[in-house]
Amino acid sequence: MRTTILCLALCTGLVCAGPASAADAPAASACKSTVSGDLRLHTLKSTIFGNERTIRVLLPPGYDDTVNKERRYPVLYMLDGQNVFDACLSDVSHHEWSVDETAQQLITGKKIPPLIVVGVDHAGRDRAREYLPYKDFVGNPDMDEPAGKLFPDFMTREVMPLVDSQYRTLPGQPNTGIGGSSYGGVATLYALLAKPGTFGYGLIESPVMWIGMGQLVRDTSPLVAMPVKVFVAFGGKETPDPVISEKMIGLVRQVETNFHAAGYDDSNFRFVVDPDAVHTEAAWEKRLPGALTFLFGDWKPTPTPQP
């Protein structure tokens, strides 16, 4: 029974606390896009995964102004790109992260620097296979063999070169972040560990840390990869069972302990428990201003060393 509950709560194509009713789902033709700002779309054909997806690039205010024509920007890559900017594309919770509105408000208010946000769409029914480096024996035991160990290479060899070739990005670990939720949070943490010289900032929401029977937790001890800053958050009601939710929080606390053992403190690793929050984009949207401010509030441009 517990496995069934967990699978319903965590292992749908797009995660949420529970399935929305049909009445909540706007018809595609009737749904009005909620995108705010200058969002540009690209189609990426992946050799690594053998499929294609949309890459959604949100440019900061003033990007095309003449005064900024030589300016380069840090980049935050967000997984599950369908859910990042537009509620019409979020076909389970029908809610978005509102990264576009939130980022623009924080930039205009000078809480964070102007940055480019890239939404990387998931692969639909292959989402779990692409995001997970280890099998989810608890919540999704019948899943295909995971291919998530290829995901960091997919980002660095296919997604990032596309973005860098089209936009004025600031390359390098001090200028590059990655974020995601649930299985996307797992992929985010794995990318931070697998590509320590690439991703300097991690935004990890509601990660499913029992994958591989806890192997990803063990991967953080000893901690070899050293990102600049990491923000992790979890809701107190991620599942209907409070015992399971507390055990999930305990796994993330072990990751926090491992980061602290490597020298991190509250200035560069933050773990937030949101007591009444469930497993949905609405919760991640609510915590987003604090996450972005923590990660990028004191960011300064760091030039890439020349060979």
Question: What are these model-derived regions, one by one?
Answer:
Residues 7-16:
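Bacterial N-terminal signal peptides
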Residues 23-307:
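Non-catalytic cap/lid and distal C-terminal segments of serine-dependent acyl enzymes
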